[in-house]
């Protein structure tokens, strides 16, 4: 095979790869936000329902960080709030409301880092307990909410 022939073959494969890459990227662009909305909605509905029914593994952690309201009242109300967030994310006209409620709720999820560091860290600042990992994963939810919120006018 000559050098020119090899270059032509490589260029042809590169063009085919670029076409395939463009098609895949277009599908990812089309589906990423709807799938993200559903995924985050499922998380909020599921985790919220667990709080409402008193079977959330995070219920005790939430109860330990609430000093103003009776935890027996607050945890189920928080669960309802989370279910509402999830439902809002599933129903397009309510996405803005869901994002708003989410951003009101999320700062509270980081309170144990300040109020209960012994529960969050095995060794500060890197060694996280399971509870700490549960809290830090909320950074992903914040990023997802920003992505969803950034496209709300496009839908």
Task: Give, region by region, the residue ranges found by the protein language model.
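Membrane-interface extramembranous regions
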Residues: 2-155
């Amino acid at each position: 095979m000559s050098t020119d022939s090899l270059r032509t073959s490589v260029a042809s494969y590169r063009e085919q790869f670029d076409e395939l890459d463009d098609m895949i990227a277009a599908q990812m662009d089309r589906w990423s936000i709807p799938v993200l909305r559903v995924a985050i909605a499922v998380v909020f509905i599921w985790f919220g329902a667990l709080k409402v029914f008193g079977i959330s593994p995070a219920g005790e952690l939430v109860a330990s960080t609430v000093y103003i309201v009776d935890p027996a009242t607050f945890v189920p109300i928080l669960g309802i709030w989370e279910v509402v967030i999830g439902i809002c994310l599933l129903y397009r006209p309510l996405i803005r409301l869901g994002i708003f409620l989410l951003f009101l709720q999320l700062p509270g999820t980081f309170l144990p880092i300040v109020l209960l560091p012994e529960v969050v860290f095995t060794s500060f600042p890197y060694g996280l307990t399971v509870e700490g990992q549960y809290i830090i994963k909320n950074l992903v939810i914040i990023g997802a909410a920003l992505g969803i919120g950034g496209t709300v006018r496009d839908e």
